[in-house]
Amino acid sequence: MRIIYNEDLNKRIIPYVDKLIKNKKKLDKETAVLFDVFIQYLDMDTRYGTYGEQLEPCITEIIREESIRNVAHLFDGKLNKLLLYLLGDEYAGLFHTYLKIKARCPYTCGYSRRSQRSVDPTLHLNHVTDALTQFLKLRATGFNEQAILNGGRTPEEIETIKDAMSCQSWMAAQIAEGNATVIEYLQNVLTSENNANRLNQGHLQAIAASGYRPLLELEGKLLLAAKLQEGLRQAIVETMDEGCPESYLYLFSIIYDNGLQRFASVKRGIAVSTGIGEQDSSDRITNKYVELIRHFLNNQEDARKALQSKDTTKLYLALWSIGFYNTEDIQALIPQIIKEGAKYQVETLLYFLRCTQYTGMNHRISKEALEVWHNEPSVVASILPLYMNGIYLSRYGNYQEGPQLIDYFETKEEAVRHYEYLKQVYQSISAKETYSPYIFFWESAFLTRSDIVLKMAYITWMLHDSALRDDLCAYLPTLETYMRAGYIGIVLNPPTSQLQEEYVLQSLGDRSVDVRDEAYKVLSDMTLSPEQNLKVEELLRFKYSEMRINAINLLMKQPKEQLADSIRRLL
């Protein structure tokens, strides 16, 4: 088993995990199943395969069963048994403190993370599972607090494992609980003039998450003292939005009061946290931009009034500032903008929603927008990235059942109506439409027929309606080849009408090898008619060797008399 790349640290952790595995018979059946799923996620050999993908759905199901509304309470029910077994009483209590902190921190993650908050536990699962593995690794080392902070117990150990000792979530919880050892350590890190305890991003993330004012004040002084240290300034600005609102507000006030937005690193950090102006931030993050952020964060009523603004930057930052405190508050404001707002307002709203990483909310809002704005292709260009986002026509994995209608539409009739809306858009545009500038002078948007057909394909997939699949066959040639191959291999496997059979047969001669391969797999499981075999014979005149092999394999499945006829025709 490999839990971490660092070999020395891995050897330190494994005995603890092995002991947990050996003693799991003490667990009740349900907790034992959860434990097995977590271990598969923990083990790097299984984390990125089918087994590793089971943890999040398991937790999501528990959230649904227990009606958990706040991430702070995620491990209060049946998950608490797993937590206690994995970590023991002390670390489990500390993890509960971490969850209370997490409820006030952004849920977004990855390169496109933004300062958006919600207590919805399903939105925090990436962060929570990462933190749980971090707590378990630290618990498994058996290190005391000082050894964890130092990255080892001896100079030799520190040299080999310190860089692999992530502990920012643990530190944040310790700060929140008033742990003097951790607080004093971070004070020394922030004020030290030597490299004994080198400041890193994990330290800054822990301080931001905890919101502990004395440490924030030291961080603010460090920000002011950075002088020519652009890297230090950027690290502070890019981590100050990973914590509670108070951390961001305090450090942002230092930036504003001292005009630090003149530095390129500060501009980049602000652009990342808001989601606009990331490219060429030095030109786009102006004093007006910074003033709007400060004003809206401190005057939420003015932010709501600004939703009627004709200035797209002001409108965007007003939406961002509302989501900064609670993304769900945006949902109540949306219907009026969609129904009564100008086109630029709706486009700006949809553009902003991409930064929320809130798939369920974004689909609901984009669905409402399509009802009203399906006759405006430029608006549809902003709708589609949010619409049914999360579905993927992958040929790999167990996707045969397809997405559930109830997760995306109220009724079958609504889904069919949206299918027709998409057809209308398809017929009203060329193969690719470009809208430039779009919302902001530096932005462009694109809408392709392939994008539209993909969403139509998702609807036919979830409806299991043969007539609708027949209708889509006329539009499938426009679909990007990889997705078209996925549609053939999943939705048209097997075909449920003669028209679908003919489309799959035609795809056997497609230019794309992916499409040809999937068509061959589908046809291999069918009994072809004499007329269909004649069409297969036609493919032998093409030069693609693998196409000819597939055609011959299909023809060889014929009864002897029909096979003899094929041979005579081909000789």
Regions found by a protein language model. Name each.
Residues 23, 41-45, 61-66, 85-90, ...:
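Residue-level signature of the C-terminal ends
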Residues 55-58, 67, 75-79, 83-105, ...:
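Extended HEAT/HEAT-like alpha-solenoid repeat tracts in very large eukaryotic scaffold/adaptor proteins
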Residues 83, 99, 103-105, 109-211, ...:
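Long amphipathic alpha-helical coiled-coil/heptad-repeat bundle
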Residues 145-148, 152, 180-189, 213-223, ...:
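Amphipathic alpha-helical scaffolding segments comprising HEAT/armadillo-like alpha-solenoid repeats
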Residues 194-196, 229, 282, 310-312, ...:
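Short inter-helical turns and helix N-cap capping residues of alpha-solenoid HEAT/ARM repeat scaffolds
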Residues 313, 467, 482-483, 499, ...:
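Structural detector for tandem alpha-solenoid helical repeats, activating at a conserved register
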